[in-house]
């Protein structure tokens, strides 16, 4: 991380709130221009900590979490930028809103919780052509007026860029696989 910071890298993603707190709290004081993205699942009971630490939460995927984030943001006086996670492969083991429910969920987040998502995020199923999932995500974003697309990881980020990714998650290419 220190080597990346020395090169000027300032946008980092984290999978877990507690790990991020340990890793970034002191570094934020040293590097006030850091931008932290939560790219892993967020438990509702961690919404307060996530709002305090992260600039972007990319894993908004259920009404209860939207409510918890809205409450935490109101109390903290700051709202992180939000992405709705779409489970484009409709995999049971993955988080995210089903593609057919995405429009209604985005509308509900806006209407019922007063939150304005700025983009969408997806993780395509392993073994399937990623481009199909990226195209689907881009289509959902376009019809909902969302400009940001977080899609593509170390193995498929080039394809994601071709389909309009505005950010990619390439941590394992830079830092190696998680232990």
Region roles according to the model:
Residues 1-155, 161-163, 175-177:
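Conserved alpha/beta-domain cores
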Residues 164-168:
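Conserved acetyl-CoA-binding loop of GNAT-fold acetyltransferases
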């Amino acid at each position: 991380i220190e080597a990346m910071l020395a090169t000027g890298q300032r946008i980092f993603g984290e999978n877990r709130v507690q790990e991020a707190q340990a890793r970034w709290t002191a570094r934020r004081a040293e590097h006030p221009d850091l931008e932290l993205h939560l790219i892993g699942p967020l438990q509702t009971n961690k919404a307060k900590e996530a709002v305090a630490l992260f600039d972007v939460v990319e894993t908004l995927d259920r009404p209860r979490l939207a409510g918890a984030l809205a409450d935490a943001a109101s109390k903290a006086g700051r709202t992180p930028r939000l992405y709705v996670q779409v489970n484009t492969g409709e995999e049971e083991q993955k988080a995210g809103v089903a593609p057919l429910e995405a429009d209604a969920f985005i509308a509900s987040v806006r209407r019922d919780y007063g939150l304005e998502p700025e983009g969408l995020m997806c993780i395509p199923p392993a073994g399937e052509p990623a481009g199909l999932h990226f195209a689907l995500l881009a289509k959902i974003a376009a019809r909902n007026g969302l400009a940001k697309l977080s899609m593509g990881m170390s193995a498929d980020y080039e394809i994601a860029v071709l389909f309009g990714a505005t950010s990619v998650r390439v941590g394992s290419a830079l830092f190696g696989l998680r232990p």
